[in-house]
From Swiss-Prot:
Entry superkingdom: Eukaryota
The protein's name in its UniProt record: Small ribosomal subunit protein bS18c
Record keywords: Chloroplast, Plastid, Ribonucleoprotein, Ribosomal protein, RNA-binding, rRNA-binding
Coiled coil: none
One Pfam assignment: Ribosomal_S18
Assembly, per entry: Part of the 30S ribosomal subunit.
Cross-referenced PROSITE patterns: RIBOSOMAL_S18
Gene Ontology BP term (one): translation
Gene Ontology cellular-component terms listed: chloroplast; ribonucleoprotein complex; ribosome
PANTHER family named in the record: 30S RIBOSOMAL PROTEIN S18, SMALL RIBOSOMAL SUBUNIT PROTEIN BS18M
Organism encoding this protein: Cucumis sativus
GO-annotated molecular function: rRNA binding; structural constituent of ribosome
NCBIfam families: S18 (TIGR00165)
Length: 104
């Protein structure tokens, strides 16, 4: 290669390969709560495939397992522990209800 072309080549950086989030020995099952709970957000939502770093097949199996666990009441549908205080009615000023008069 010419010396001018070599200037633009980037050096290859070494990277550490990430371990898969689900080891090969783990079975994806609705009863395996320790595995399922890793793929649910704090609000109780199923995390996306990008966040989980799962394959398409694994994400489908996790989603089905979570939905089965919810139906069997092993998992809550929503986790609203934090948001309960947000929707409580606060002390507000009383409304003044007056008589409406029509101008003729």
């Amino acid at each position: 290669m010419d010396k001018s072309k070599r200037l633009f080549l980037k050096s290859k950086r070494s990277f550490r390969r990430r371990l898969p989030p689900i080891p090969s020995g783990d079975r994806i099952d609705y009863r395996n709560m320790s595995l399922i709970s890793r793929f649910i957000s704090e609000q109780g939502k199923i995390l996306s495939r990008r966040v989980n770093r799962l394959t398409l097949k694994q994400q489908r199996l996790i989603t089905i397992a979570i939905k089965q666990a919810r139906i069997l009441s092993l998992l809550p549908f929503l986790n609203n522990d934090k948001n309960d205080k947000q929707f409580e009615r606060s002390e507000s000023t009383p409304r003044t209800i007056g008589l409406r008069t029509r101008n003729k």
